[in-house]
Amino acid sequence: MVLVLAAGTSGAAQADCKFTATREGSADLAGVTKVVVAAGPGELSIVGSADARRIVARGNACASSQELLDRLNLEVRREGDTVFIDAGLARAINMITIGTVYAHINVGIALPTNLPVEARDSSGPVSVSGVAALKLDDSSGDIEVRDVGSVEIKDSSGDILVDGVRGDATVTFDGSGDIEIRDVGGNAEVGSDGSGNIRFSGVLGNVLVGNDGSGDIVVENAGGDFTVGNDGSGTINHRGVAGKVTLPER
């Protein structure tokens, strides 16, 4: 069975949500050491709270038909010490992104602050706050991360904001979109960036940009070294760097 789906979650799909439903799931905390999230099209919000007594996921499903709505799932299950949260269309469906047919689910997840999170998201905005550690693989959509222990992001497109990291903040790969990383207690790194501006501020450790295709790079107030490996185009500006500054020759 092949279903034709809208490529994104904006436009007609958002304004004309013909069929809607709520989804919910939860899991006990005892013995849990990690949460793994897989989300399809739609908004994804993950919030850590010191008051959380369970892991709770709630979703608002939206589709152009009842058949598609019935296939939009939100599953919370536990395997050993890991809780898995899966949101989106049933795996048995093949999807072609064309036309006006649409299906997506906006998901909010609440969990304790001491749990690390691994998340994979296909499209739509992502916001994460208050978790012990975050590893995020995102295809498209803006990303906002605040008040986390550490963060590692791989992103194809969309802007990235990271604000408030107690440890290290790393963007391993970013295809396009601006990146802003600020208030970091450890090191801050962008491994490879295709296009878009990059800004660092308030980093206690080292700042590293491995490879930058295009866009400006700005560093303000870094406690360690500032290093750029390769830079295709765009300006590089820095002030308040306590350590060594190493930039590519032009």
Regions found by a protein language model. Give the residues of each.
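Intrinsically disordered, low-complexity segments enriched in Gly and acidic/Ser/Thr residues
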Residues: F200-V203, L208-V209
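Hydrophilic extracytoplasmic domains
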Residues: V218-R250
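Periodic glycine anchor positions in long extracellular repeat architectures
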Residues: G124, G141, G158, G175-G177, ...
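Acidic (Asp/Glu) and glycine-rich low-complexity loops/linkers
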Residues: G11-D121, P125-D138, E144-K154, L161-F173, ...
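Calcium-binding motifs, dominated by EF-hand helix-loop-helix domains
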Residues: V171, V190, V209-N211, V228-N230
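Bacterial N-terminal signal peptides
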Residues: M1-G8
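Conserved positions within tandem-repeat grammars
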Residues: D163, R182, S201, I217-E220, ...
